[in-house]
Amino acid sequence: MKANMRCWLLVAFFTALPMVARAEWQAVEKVETYAIAGKTGIELYESIGERGPKIRGLVRAIAHTDFKLTWSRKYENQDGACVLVSARPNLTITYTLPKPAEKLPAASRRNWETFFIGMRDHEKVHGEMIKKLVKDIEAATVGMSVPGDPKCLKIRAELKKRLSELFVAHQQRNRDFDRVEMGDGGNIHQLILKLVNGG
């Protein structure tokens, strides 16, 4: 009886391996900072405006979340069809946040810490959206099959189409989130007011 039980447990374990392997990946998350000058909230905010990261080389932001995503994909020819049998992501998310270059007075430091934590948490939401994008890509592409594609050439065009659709949806989620956060009365708007007004 015990031997049979061990056998069934082993079968269940190895049957579950592909599912486990798919869930194993983890994003590497890094925080980079840029130096800002000033002792008061308004001085710090003005320095952010001068030194903040440029988005697409055009507009400066308070903070920014970027990512690098590569894939290890395995294709198989199955009866003349090309099948994407596995895809393992390698994801690095980088958060860029401001950091005062000098020690701040006590009152400014408290206000700054509130501002910084709020901005960090905002960017972390963008990070979670990136992770969702990667999971959506996995769900939409692993197992996809293109008939009449023994050399796995046509499947790449179909893959590109699916990725494009998912990325457009991802960008829209980010824009919608920022619109609420940065609008009048939004979280970022409130954080800026409290930093600048010292309250």
Task: Give a label for each model feature.
Residues 8-18:
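Bacterial N-terminal signal peptides
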Residues 131-141:
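Membrane-interfacial alpha-helical segments at the cytosolic side of multi-pass membrane proteins
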Residues 24-103, 147-199:
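Metalloprotease/metallohydrolase-associated module, dominated by Zn2+-dependent proteases
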Residues 110:
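Phosphate/adenylate-binding glycine loop and adjacent helical scaffold
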Residues 118, 122-130:
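Active-site recognition of the HExxH zinc-binding catalytic motif
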Residues 1-9:
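Bacterial N-terminal signal peptides that target proteins for export
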